[in-house]
Amino acid sequence: MAVGKNKGLAKSGKKGLKKKIVDPFTRKDWYDVKAPSLFTNRDIGKTLVNRTAGTKIASDSLKGRVFEVSLADLQGESEAERSFRKFRLIAEEVQGRYLLTNFHGMDFTTDKLRSLVKKWQTLIECSVDVKTTDSYLLRVFCIGFTQKDQRSQRKTCYAQHTQVRAIRKKMTEIITKEISSGDLKEAVSKLIPDSIAKDIEKSCHSIYPIHEVYIRKVKVLKKPKFDMGKLLDMHGEGAVTKRVTTEDGTGVVISRPEGYEPPIQESV
């Protein structure tokens, strides 16, 4: 047995003492995520990012992040009536400590979608590619089910193939008409109460009674060139109003978006 000090262990011990444990969160900042003004609850959460260091700018890392939020949370509803609908919001601009988002899609939760499918009825689906007036290309998916007549003694309520085609055609026409007639802001405002699905249900009743009609999914396929003015228009109701007193004592009300930072002056 060798007697003496183990030089390797002694060296490794010294190196271990010199190491400093640095908390990674000391190099990060929190940013507030703001939803468009179409929704009741605009503060949807916070996100973390590394501070600007060298060529790595914090705002560049934040842009493009996608947040998925339940409609019940966006509308501030405690009931679970609309919690199965999820809106996707994408970060497009950073103003101060605020992250301004825009609509990036909509989807259903898997459990809700699976619960709709039942026996003894016909499932009718359609998908349409529609362009809004401000050049957003959306792919809209619609779903509906045939409804049993209360007076009928039959167990099933299957629709004929010609009726399914007629209903699908009517779905396509209504979706195209409603989405293409306005910009993205108007399209989102129609998706929140699902008014398009209600119109489809009423219009298709003459062909075959249907129920549980939903716009189940929306994808943003193409976007126009980024326009700061239109993004601020989506967040228009979130402007901060301040009262400034002039030299003669009169007050002037000014309106600025949340997170506004004044430009740097070249000279004073």
Curated annotation (Swiss-Prot):
GO terms for biological process: translation. Transmembrane segments: none annotated. Belongs to the eukaryotic ribosomal protein eS1 family. Keywords: Cytoplasm, Ribonucleoprotein, Ribosomal protein. Component of the small ribosomal subunit. Mature ribosomes consist of a small (40S) and a large (60S) subunit. The 40S subunit contains about 33 different proteins and 1 molecule of RNA (18S). The 60S subunit contains about 49 different proteins and 3 molecules of RNA (28S, 5.8S and 5S). PROSITE patterns: RIBOSOMAL_S3AE. PANTHER family: 40S RIBOSOMAL PROTEIN S3A. Pfam families: Ribosomal_S3Ae. SMART domains: Ribosomal_S3Ae (SM01397). This is Small ribosomal subunit protein eS1. It is found in: Cytoplasm. One of its GO terms (molecular function) is structural constituent of ribosome. One of its GO terms (cellular component) is cytosolic small ribosomal subunit.
